[in-house]
């Protein structure tokens, strides 16, 4: 890796996306891994699926050995113009609406739904019981 390295745009690197011409972007550097496709332990399809984007996360998630990282040097062709790589949008879930933070009103409603029928039943039973004794 001596001298000035060539700087590529994402569009330029994205053109190299097949089994006869395969380039990857890893940690801001561009690698021509075409010759390595057949020898890659995970298969060439794994490498081809990582073309046209920043493959750094894919590379790091696998947990490559130090010898695999050293092999990258022989496939190095230049650097990527980082301004051409789209920024990752971090997903933030929408905040949940807080309809009823004070649960006391909900509790009172449930309590009344339980007690009102019992009170009606008790009154009906009492009326029936007292009218039966009087007669």
Swiss-Prot record:
Keyword Heme among UniProt keywords: yes
SMART domains with a match to the protein in the record: Cyt-b5 (SM01117)
Family assignment from sequence similarity: Belongs to the cytochrome b5 family.
InterPro entries registered for this protein in UniProt: Cyt_B5-like_heme/steroid-bd (IPR001199), Cyt_B5-like_heme/steroid_sf (IPR036400), Cyt_B5_heme-BS (IPR018506), Cytochrome_b5 (IPR050668)
Sequence intervals crossing the membrane: 107-127
PANTHER family linked: CYTOCHROME B5, CYTOCHROME B5 ISOFORM B
Positions with a binding annotation for heme: 40, 64
Principal place of residence: endoplasmic reticulum
Record-level GO cellular component terms: endoplasmic reticulum membrane; intracellular membrane-bounded organelle; membrane
SUPFAM superfamilies, A to Z: Cytochrome b5-like heme/steroid binding domain
Subcellular location: Endoplasmic reticulum membrane; Microsome membrane
Domain of life, per lineage: Eukaryota
Sequence ranges assigned to domain Cytochrome b5 heme-binding in this UniProt record: 5-81
Function per UniProt: Cytochrome b5 is a membrane bound hemoprotein which function as an electron carrier for several membrane bound oxygenases. May play a key role in the modification by desaturation of fatty acids in the endoplasmic reticulum, which in the developing seed is utilized for membrane synthesis and in the developmentally regulated production of large amounts of storage lipids.
Tissue: Specifically expressed in developing seeds.
Membrane-topology descriptor: Single-pass membrane protein
Name of the protein in its database record: Cytochrome b5, seed isoform
Pfam annotation, one family: Cyt-b5
GO molecular function: heme binding; metal ion binding
PROSITE patterns per UniProt: CYTOCHROME_B5_1, CYTOCHROME_B5_2
Annotated keywords: Electron transport, Endoplasmic reticulum, Heme, Iron, Membrane, Metal-binding, Microsome, Transmembrane, Transmembrane helix, Transport
